[in-house]
Amino acid sequence: GLGDVYKRQMEGLFVVDVDGQIQNGLCDSYEVSDDQKTYTFHIRDNAKWSDGTPVTAQDFEYAWKRNATAQGDYSKFTYQIEMAAIKNYEAVTSGEADADELGVTAVDDNTLQVELEYPVPFFLNLLTFSPWAPVKESKLTEEGDQFGVDKDSVLYCGAYTLDQWDVGGNTIVLKKNPDYWDAENVDVDEIDLVVISDTQQAVMAYQNGDVDNVTLTGDMVS
């Protein structure tokens, strides 16, 4: 799905591997306080954006505070953010508190500290979802309302960059990101995704060898 496409381009602190296990993404290491309410994450020294600049703790702080103050319909992501129980989140989203009071702090370029209202045993699981990816503030400011509308208006920090995407078209092409921190272990140089709205046609394309992978609906699995 499109969520998987996004995760290939934008990596967060943690990722889920092919076996469904949580692995470190842009997080090199972390500590948790005895009361399980304070997490300290250390960003990889070699984590980079696709323009070659470092991914920093400030990029995560900016993105997460932006999530709490964003306007518009983000209902599909809201539950993922609310369940994290970050300190003062409700007060910030309601306007009772400023975004600076959210429990997310970039201690330095490579250290992100997060305070929770109460222990959340699945907190690291939540951090594998899309809303927790970093955003480079200077790029967003530069692009303004054009941020994200085409492949060149975004910086990528995942294994792939968006190489081709035509709005309204049916093909998405991803290219290996040479600036990705683990690029040497990315074996596939290009991924071509074809949008086929009819599931039967998609299955036929798979059977004919036109595509390598297809998503099935529940009634087609036996």
PLM segments and residue spans:
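N-terminal lobe/hinge region of extracytoplasmic solute-binding protein
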Residues: 1-34, 155
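Extracytoplasmic/secreted proteins, especially bacterial periplasmic and envelope-associated proteins
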Residues: 8, 17, 21, 25, ...
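Sec-exported extracytoplasmic/periplasmic mature domains
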Residues: 14-18, 45-48, 65-73, 119-121, ...
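Aromatic- and charge-enriched surface segment that lines or borders ligand/interaction sites
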Residues: 28-79, 113, 205
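Structural recognition of the beta-strand scaffold that forms the well-ordered cores
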Residues: 39-42, 112, 173, 192-195, ...
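Surface-exposed binding/hinge segments that line
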Residues: 61, 75-138
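Gly/Pro-rich hinge or "lid" segments in bacterial periplasmic/extracellular proteins
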Residues: 116-186, 190
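Ligand-site clamp/hinge motif
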Residues: 178-222
